[in-house]
Every structure is written in structure tokens, then in C-alpha cells.
């Protein structure tokens, strides 16, 4: 595989390569201007409590699956939590000022771990891959990659792709956006290993809900076409330097609202 640049778009051996990931795709679909700020301009953003809490929980669950099956219980996760929190503080000193009430922070993290054990029994199965990076060239100009929380392969060969969410589950009928992310991972796995995943699974620790979906070759072919179309749209936007802002309720949560042309006319 050819050498990669560290930026979202860059020149590699004389060819411009667009780096696509589920998060950057989501940015572009929600608001092309947001995509520009993050992927093209690479403007810095302060860390958010929600994102940092998600990282912490993911790291605890990753460590949990390193333990023997008999030790994968709530007590072990509870013991891992403060260790992972101290490591996070050492790696990111901004967390010290971001988290103003450490007890409340850890209590909320503990509640999410408790919810995890109410919807899954990690001592009953083996996880094959955790925090695995998958990548693939969609075209000569579009490179797709993503980090998958967990992939489980059953002794009989069935593949399950799992993603942890520390927020609450979407309302009925609004699951598609989250499932699209998992279809991207399923497509990457299929292209890399030649095996069609059997099950996509979203674990919402905020309200102890599980969303499951099967997957077919027809769906993955459709996902492939959709990704290529989105990639072409982004490449056109880059070529034309046209990233129109898209106003929505999400604007109130956007760090770049103060400089966005949609709110400064």
C-alpha cells in the first residue's frame, strides 16, 4: 500500500489523495463548512467532556478483554477505571482543567460501565480484535479508513462488528446514521478479509440499549457506491473551494459558530 500523508488531503507521489473516515463523512454531510474547518484547515478544537469520557470508557473495555474470561466482570472494570483515568491525565494535561469535579466524572463513567454489563456478558465469548484500524483504497483518489471498537469472530466463522456509544440510543426510525458507520466498517472488513460480516451491533451505554442489524452484499455494494459519490462531492468541493455552511440545531454545539459565515453576515 502506498505511503500516506498525515493530513486529510495531500499530495502522495504526485497524486492528490482524499482520506475518508466515518467521522469526516459525517462532518461533510452535516455541514460542508464544518468539514472544511476540520479536514482542510485543520483548525484546533478544545477537548469536550463527552469525547474524553468516551475515550476513557473505550480504553477500560479494551483492557477488560485482555483479561481471562473469568475475570471480565464489573469489579475488574471498576478497578481498571481509575488506572486508565490516571493514564489519561498524564497523557493529556488539559483534562485537569476540563474536569472540575473528579468524583462526579468518575461516578458517571462508573455508571456507564455498570450499564455495559447489563447488556453484554463479556465472560461468555472471546473478542478477536479491539480498536483495530481498517483501511482500503476505494479509488485512485479516495482512501477509506476507520477504527473499529471490536470485532468478534465466532468459532463457526461468523463475524460481528461492535461499536460502543456512551450516549443514549436514537429514537426509533433514526438509527440509520449510526448503522451507516458500521456498514462502512463492514465494507472495510469485507474488502480486507474477503469475509462478509454477519452482524452489526451498537451498544448504547447511556441508556443500556442495543441496536442490531444484519448485513448483505447488496447493502455493502450500495454503501460502496454511496462512499464513492460522497468522495467525489468532497473532491469537487475542494477543487471549487466551495463549502457552503448548512444551518441546523447542531450549530449551537459547534465550536466554530463564532467564525462561521452563516452566523456572521
Where do the language-model regions lie?
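Charged, compositionally biased N-terminal leader segments and the immediate start
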Residues: 2-23
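Metal-dependent nuclease catalytic regions and adjoining charged, substrate-binding loops involved
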Residues: 5, 19, 75, 156, ...
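Short beta-strand or tight-loop elements
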Residues: 21, 126-132, 144-148, 247
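Nuclease catalytic cores
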Residues: 25-26, 30-69, 106, 110-114, ...
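Short acidic (Asp/Glu) and glycine-rich catalytic loops that position anionic groups and cofactors
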Residues: 34-41, 58-59, 88-90, 162-166, ...
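Short, polar/flexible loop-turn hinges at active-site or ligand-entry regions and domain interfaces
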Residues: 42-50, 67-72, 98, 171-172, ...
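A non-catalytic, helix-rich entry segment at domain boundaries
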Residues: 60-130, 137
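Mg2+/Mn2+-dependent nuclease catalytic core
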Residues: 132-225
Amino acid at each position: 500500500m502506498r505511503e500516506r500523508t498525515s493530513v486529510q488531503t495531500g499530495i502522495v507521489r504526485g497524486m492528490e489523495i482524499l482520506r475518508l473516515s466515518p467521522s469526516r463523512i459525517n462532518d461533510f454531510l452535516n455541514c460542508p463548512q464544518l468539514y472544511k474547518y476540520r479536514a482542510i484547515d485543520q483548525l484546533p478544537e478544545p477537548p469536550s467532556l463527552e469525547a474524553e469520557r468516551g475515550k476513557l470508557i473505550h480504553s477500560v473495555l479494551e483492557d477488560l478483554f485482555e483479561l481471562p474470561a473469568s475475570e471480565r466482570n464489573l469489579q475488574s472494570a471498576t478497578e481498571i477505571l481509575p488506572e486508565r483515568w490516571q493514564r489519561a491525565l498524564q497523557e493529556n494535561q488539559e483534562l485537569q482543567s476540563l474536569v472540575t469535579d473528579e468524583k462526579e466524572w468518575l461516578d458517571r463513567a462508573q455508571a456507564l460501565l455498570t450499564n455495559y454489563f447489563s447488556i453484554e456478558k463479556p465472560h461468555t465469548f472471546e473478542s478477536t480484535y479491539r480498536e483495530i484500524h481498517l483501511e482500503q483504497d476505494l479509488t485512485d483518489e479516495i482512501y477509506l479508513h476507520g477504527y473499529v471498537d471490536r470485532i468478534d469472530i465466532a468459532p463457526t466463522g461468523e463475524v460481528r462488528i461492535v461499536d460502543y456509544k456512551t450516549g443514549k440510543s436514537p429514537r426509533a426510525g433514526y438509527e440509520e446514521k449510526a448503522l451507516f458507520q458500521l456498514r462502512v466498517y463492514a465494507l472495510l472488513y469485507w474488502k480486507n478479509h474477503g469475509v462478509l460480516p454477519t452482524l452489526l451491533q451498537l451498544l448504547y451505554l447511556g441508556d443500556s440499549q442495543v441496536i442490531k442489524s444484519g448485513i448483505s452484499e447488496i447493502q455493502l455494494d450500495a454503501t460502496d457506491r454511496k462512499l464513492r459519490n460522497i468522495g467525489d462531492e468532497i473532491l469537487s468541493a475542494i477543487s471549487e473551494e466551495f463549502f457552503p455552511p448548512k444551518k441546523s440545531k447542531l450549530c449551537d454545539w459547534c465550536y466554530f459558530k463564532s467564525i462561521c459565515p452563516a452566523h456572521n453576515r
